[in-house]
Amino acid sequence: MTIYVFSQLILNWYHINGRKNLPWKKDKTLYKVWISEIMLQQTTVKTAIPYFKNFISRFPNIQSLNQSKLDDILCLWSGLGYYKRAENIYKTVKIIKEEFQEKFPTGFSDLIKLPGIGRSTAGAILSLSLDYFFPILEGNVKRILMRYYGIIGYVTEKKIEQKLWYLIELITPIHNTGSFNQGIMDIGALICTPKNPKCNLCPLIQKCIAYKEKNWIKYPLKKKKKIILEKKSWFVVIKYQNQFWIEKNTEKKIWKNLFCFPNFDTKIKTIEWLKKNKINIDKKHKKIQSFYHKFSHFTLHIIPILVNLSFFKNFQNSKKTGIWYDLKNTHDIGLPKPVQKILEIFK
């Protein structure tokens, strides 16, 4: 199969079956495509869609986003995870204001310098919004190329990545680049999936080596799963009437700049903090069941300790970034999923 035929098969499939109704494709702008591409890093389309809609509803353009605080962005990002992406959006919009007069840059060399934007993301933004000729190489594309050409190796290997970039640059058409890029990503997401691919629906089936070998599972090779470590965290859930004490996490890497309950990695530290703040635990009080929260590299066993205060106590002296979170009011702050989960119990 020639390079032209490969790209034409992708384009033909996309025009008939492609996902053209994705929210960032309606009234398409550089800004919307940028937000969507950042959200889609480490997140599926299905999960990203409601977050994208809420984000654009609140910040429809660069100008409105520029008026925001980091807490505003983190609030809309709450629950989506990988919060560094939200910080990168905040940093990027400030750079765009200072260096590009609030106009989204259209040069590849300018884009790739912005926080959170690498070679593939820059190519996706420019090709999907302006139809510029820039190939992309994200997870779906890598998997398709390795299966189609029978490339054995790990996607993280430098030599494999170099080979894949070489191939995708040859295959990507100069015209209709945006449609091709979206098409090949759609095929990877809908058909050439990591598990149980729907090969009979794939436009590339005739020359696909993985299909001929009936052995798609080895393309790409998978590294042995590392043993997932388990860590513990004691959450002190301080409640006064309908309010909860939460503190901005400015030091720890996990959930940085999000608001959390006071939390500690040992029971001893938890008890010491309670004593220091003269807080007694009433064993008769309602208990919150412990639960697990998964990260990419470890699992966190969260043990909530509920403290019902009979009188208002101000903790501002110990933590200037703390607030009383009222369930009846709205707060434009970022909350990690476990904190949201605990608060939901009391709503």
From Swiss-Prot:
<feature type="active site" description="Proton donor/acceptor">
    <location>
        <position position="37"/>
    </location>
</feature>
<dbReference type="InterPro" id="IPR000445">
    <property type="entry name" value="HhH_motif"/>
</dbReference>
<dbReference type="InterPro" id="IPR011257">
    <property type="entry name" value="DNA_glycosylase"/>
</dbReference>
<dbReference type="InterPro" id="IPR004035">
    <property type="entry name" value="Endouclease-III_FeS-bd_BS"/>
</dbReference>
<dbReference type="InterPro" id="IPR023170">
    <property type="entry name" value="HhH_base_excis_C"/>
</dbReference>
<dbReference type="InterPro" id="IPR015797">
    <property type="entry name" value="NUDIX_hydrolase-like_dom_sf"/>
</dbReference>
<comment type="subunit">
    <text>Monomer.</text>
</comment>
<dbReference type="InterPro" id="IPR003651">
    <property type="entry name" value="Endonuclease3_FeS-loop_motif"/>
</dbReference>
<dbReference type="GO" id="GO:0006298">
    <property type="term" value="P:mismatch repair"/>
</dbReference>
<feature type="binding site">
    <location>
        <position position="208"/>
    </location>
    <ligand>
        <name>[4Fe-4S] cluster</name>
    </ligand>
</feature>
<dbReference type="InterPro" id="IPR029119">
    <property type="entry name" value="MutY_C"/>
</dbReference>
<keyword id="KW-0411">Iron-sulfur</keyword>
<keyword id="KW-0378">Hydrolase</keyword>
<dbReference type="InterPro" id="IPR044298">
    <property type="entry name" value="MIG/MutY"/>
</dbReference>
<feature type="site" description="Transition state stabilizer">
    <location>
        <position position="138"/>
    </location>
</feature>
<keyword id="KW-0227">DNA damage</keyword>
<feature type="binding site">
    <location>
        <position position="199"/>
    </location>
    <ligand>
        <name>[4Fe-4S] cluster</name>
    </ligand>
</feature>
<dbReference type="InterPro" id="IPR005760">
    <property type="entry name" value="A/G_AdeGlyc_MutY"/>
</dbReference>
<dbReference type="GO" id="GO:0034039">
    <property type="term" value="F:8-oxo-7,8-dihydroguanine DNA N-glycosylase activity"/>
</dbReference>
<dbReference type="Pfam" id="PF00730">
    <property type="entry name" value="HhH-GPD"/>
</dbReference>
<protein>
    <recommendedName>
        <fullName>Adenine DNA glycosylase</fullName>
        <ecNumber>3.2.2.31</ecNumber>
    </recommendedName>
</protein>
<feature type="binding site">
    <location>
        <position position="192"/>
    </location>
    <ligand>
        <name>[4Fe-4S] cluster</name>
    </ligand>
</feature>
<dbReference type="GO" id="GO:0006284">
    <property type="term" value="P:base-excision repair"/>
</dbReference>
<keyword id="KW-0479">Metal-binding</keyword>
<dbReference type="InterPro" id="IPR003265">
    <property type="entry name" value="HhH-GPD_domain"/>
</dbReference>
<dbReference type="GO" id="GO:0032357">
    <property type="term" value="F:oxidized purine DNA binding"/>
</dbReference>
<keyword id="KW-0408">Iron</keyword>
<keyword id="KW-0004">4Fe-4S</keyword>
<dbReference type="GO" id="GO:0046872">
    <property type="term" value="F:metal ion binding"/>
</dbReference>
<keyword id="KW-0326">Glycosidase</keyword>
<dbReference type="GO" id="GO:0051539">
    <property type="term" value="F:4 iron, 4 sulfur cluster binding"/>
</dbReference>
<dbReference type="Pfam" id="PF14815">
    <property type="entry name" value="NUDIX_4"/>
</dbReference>
<comment type="function">
    <text>Adenine glycosylase active on G-A mispairs. MutY also corrects error-prone DNA synthesis past GO lesions which are due to the oxidatively damaged form of guanine: 7,8-dihydro-8-oxoguanine (8-oxo-dGTP).</text>
</comment>
<comment type="similarity">
    <text>Belongs to the Nth/MutY family.</text>
</comment>
<dbReference type="Pfam" id="PF00633">
    <property type="entry name" value="HHH"/>
</dbReference>
<dbReference type="GO" id="GO:0035485">
    <property type="term" value="F:adenine/guanine mispair binding"/>
</dbReference>
<keyword id="KW-0234">DNA repair</keyword>
<dbReference type="GO" id="GO:0000701">
    <property type="term" value="F:purine-specific mismatch base pair DNA N-glycosylase activity"/>
</dbReference>
<feature type="binding site">
    <location>
        <position position="202"/>
    </location>
    <ligand>
        <name>[4Fe-4S] cluster</name>
    </ligand>
</feature>
<dbReference type="InterPro" id="IPR004036">
    <property type="entry name" value="Endonuclease-III-like_CS2"/>
</dbReference>
